């Protein structure tokens, strides 16, 4: 089963702290040969399948909030851990939910599960997030856009094609230009990494543009399928429910994809935060 990593989609959000990660309250008390962890983290992706989980925890109270945070690897089978599913608007089937809240109550974590040095978790998390945010987007976005083009060339029940709608195709063309520009940026960053440099603030740029383009593509997909996206009644298989989907697989999943991808501009640091990072580190504001 997968090891769940703090640098993945929704692991950076702690209960009641939202995107203000430095204010996290999940604590790890030093008990000699182990830490005693209490607190919660939320929007944890696939926690129900994980054997291990990486957590940022507060090991000391400091004047500067970013200090006193440490990086722990915690066994998900430990006593005191409870995983509660979060039902989301994309209406995934029972037992197939994506995100969870993980609660820690007096969870014992061996000292050897500390990653790096105590109190330097913030530094490690920022480094990992650079690579998560700078993840390559263009290849997948190209595929999604090509799928839209293909579907747009199919006649609807009235004999019309969206590929003949100038407004729809203009929206497609604008997104393709943006993806081309992003691919060029990704290739430049790969060159920098090969030269031994870090990703830097460009990762915030890629995360912002990549997720917003992805959201725009899901919006066009819903527009393309029209009323086939409305029923939104058959998200997947459930025990005892075998009603066939209405419309094609693409049409049947357009609305769930649209709702699910609303999260993309929030996870790994909201896009508003990414713009603040770019303003500070790139523009010096």
Can you say where each PLM-predicted feature lies in the sequence?
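Glycine-rich phosphate/cofactor-binding loops in nucleotide/flavin-utilizing enzymes
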Residues: 119-135, 228-285
């Amino acid at each position: 089963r997968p090891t769940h990593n703090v640098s993945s989609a929704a692991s950076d959000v702690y209960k009641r702290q939202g995107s203000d990660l430095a204010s996290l309250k999940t604590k790890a008390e030093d008990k000699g040969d182990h830490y005693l962890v209490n607190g919660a983290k939320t929007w944890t992706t696939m926690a129900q399948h994980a054997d291990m989980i990486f957590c940022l925890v507060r090991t000391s109270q400091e004047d500067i909030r970013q200090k006193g945070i440490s990086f722990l690897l915690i066994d998900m089978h430990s006593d005191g851990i409870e995983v509660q599913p979060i039902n989301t608007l994309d209406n995934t089937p029972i037992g197939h939910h994506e995100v969870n809240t993980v609660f820690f109550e007096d969870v014992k974590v061996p000292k050897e599960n500390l990653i790096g040095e105590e109190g330097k978790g913030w530094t490690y998390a920022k480094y990992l997030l650079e690579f998560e945010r700078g993840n390559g987007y263009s290849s997948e976005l190209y595929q999604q856009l090509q799928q839209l083009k293909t579907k747009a060339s199919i006649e609807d029940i009235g004999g019309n094609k969206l590929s003949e709608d100038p407004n729809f195709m203009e929206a497609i063309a604008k997104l393709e230009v943006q993806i081309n520009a992003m691919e060029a940026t990704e290739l430049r960053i790969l060159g920098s990494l090969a030269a031994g440099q870090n990703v830097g603030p460009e990762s915030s740029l890629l995360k912002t543009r990549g997720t917003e383009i992805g959201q725009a593509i899901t919006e066009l997909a819903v527009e393309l399928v029209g009323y086939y996206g409305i029923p939104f009644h058959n998200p997947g298989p459930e025990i005892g429910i075998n009603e066939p989907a209405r419309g094609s697989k693409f049409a049947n999943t357009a609305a769930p994809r649209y709702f699910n991808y609303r999260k993309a501009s929030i996870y790994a640091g909201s896009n508003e935060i990414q713009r603040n990072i770019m303003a500070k580190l790139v523009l010096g504001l």
